[in-house]
Amino acid sequence: NNEIGVFIGGSNYIGDVGPTTYINPFKYNGSRLKLLETIGTETTFYSLGLIYRKNFNSRISARFKINYANIGSDDKMPSSDLYRQERGKSFQNTILEYGLGIDFNFIDFDVLDSSIQMTPYINTGISLFSSNLLRYKKGISSAEKYGSFYNYSIPITIGYKIKPFQSFIIGFEITANATFTDNLDGNDPHENAIIAPLYDEAFGSTLSNDWYVFSGITLTYLFGNKK
């Protein structure tokens, strides 16, 4: 009744820089990001993770996960709002996430049954993540790193999984993570009085926090299959 496996997919962010597309993990114009090694190319923002799942019954299971992802955005992208394109900010950041949550299967999913099993599912819980503190030096459009911080997020996952073989489960899922910070993109830096004049002030909306989204596949191996 236990599973261990991996998550592989793309990532994107929703906040105060660049487009506001909710799910867009795969292609990004990184020509303006000084932090990228491949200047002028299309960049894929990825997410990789490890999963452990404990199945209590055919409907309910607990999940522990560790995910690493890179995120970024650019005001100059064509799908950005006009005022953002004129502002011209861009950034790149990383996220290291530890999460615990509950999966609910909409259809009975018996991991001990040798027949093919499949079901849509949802998941939610709580995650602790670390990320880089960013800020924008006056006259420079790309954000720079100046530290790190920890924060929490609430994941909301929808997915579909299938057990085509006795010991393996394949899943396809999208997880939107609502954070408790508005600073994944560096739009709300906290500067001391000495260096503050060298950097831009806060910008963007203060009415909502940033989100990050993971879209991809899971592959898990079943072990300890005893009722």
Task: State where each predicted segment sits.
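Gram-negative (and chloroplast) outer-membrane scaffold detector with strong preference
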Residues: 54, 58-137, 221-223
